[in-house]
Amino acid sequence: YDLQHYFRMMRDEGCDYVVMEASSQAFKLHRVDAITFDYGIFTNIEPDHIGPNEHADFEEYKYYKSCIFKQSRVGIINLDADYADELLAGAPCKMFTYAIDRAADFMADNIEHVNCPDFVGISFDVSGHTELEIQMDLPGKYNVYNAMAAISVLSLIGIPHRAIMSAFRRVHVDGRTQIVFKNDTMSVLVDYAHNEMAMENLLSTLRELQPKRLVVVFGCGGNRAKDRRYGMGKAAAEFADLSILTADNSRDEETTDIIADIKSTLVPAGGHYVEIPDRREAIEYAMTHAEKGDMIAVIGKGHEDYQEVKGVRTHFLDREVILETAAKYKL
């Protein structure tokens, strides 16, 4: 009952709302038992988190993802997501929907990218249950979906329209599509994308900004489902001009073995790559070999401030390394 303890502490401090992420593992391992959510949101699902330490197969994963509706007074679902109709039909609570490509209770359209010197974002209109004009410093269709999930809840609990629009103009998510360094040659950003879907969403969005080259620096976590490595290798081959393969949190595995798994799908798909296992050196290579007009995406860790190798965590923050590299080489 750790969660209940923390909820009580929050209430004692005057907190009225709690926004939390509940993973499929949380439902499987009973971490969120005895909790009724006022609003439960289902964003999307893909074949991930399947392995000895997570879920036995996709059906089990899907089942535990859907358990959120059993513990919610009101459910909200992305109607464009795979299996949305199936989950909507089986939901035991009152449901609302949001979408871009289908008719829903909350719909987004007129989506436009905004690319300014110090701002890479998106604007769109909301219609249906409410009408809003949204602009935010987070680009990509996938971020529109994330915003629509939040907008659905905010509208249903009665937050004024002006407050919602104002909040989105100021929204910032640490380590998500975060531009860290920019000069006349390159733009360098960090993002937490650490599986195939997230990587495809990010890189396809950055492609729409039409950089001369799209360079991605990434690895994969050790002791996690290997399918992530194969999926990210395919995504890199499809969307990146150059992949710099490096360490993430290798944990108990060898970084070179993880990179070999990534290469097993990246190379057959025609992807170009450089292999630099040391993450700092990989970032330095990307920035010191940049060509005019390059966009460099350092992904997989986002806001994380550590690297875990052989059970030891050491301080490592991608954005610090990017800024240190810029200063070191006077970029």
Feature annotation, model-predicted:
Residues 11-13, 38-188, 263-270:
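Acidic, Mg2+-coordinating active-site environments of NTP-dependent enzymes
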Residues 1, 20-27, 56-60, 169-173, ...:
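Short gly/ser/thr-rich secondary-structure transition/capping motifs
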Residues 92, 129, 149-331:
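ATP-dependent carboxylate-amine ligase
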Residues 1-23, 30:
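Conserved nucleotide-sensing/catalytic segment adjacent to the nucleotide-binding pocket
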Residues 15-25, 187-194:
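Switch II (G3) loop of P-loop NTPases
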Residues 21, 44, 78, 217-219, ...:
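Short beta-strand segments
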Residues 33-45, 211-217:
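Inter-motif core of Ras-like GTPase G domains
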Residues 10-16, 72, 211, 293:
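Short, high-confidence coil segments that cap the C-terminus of an alpha-helix
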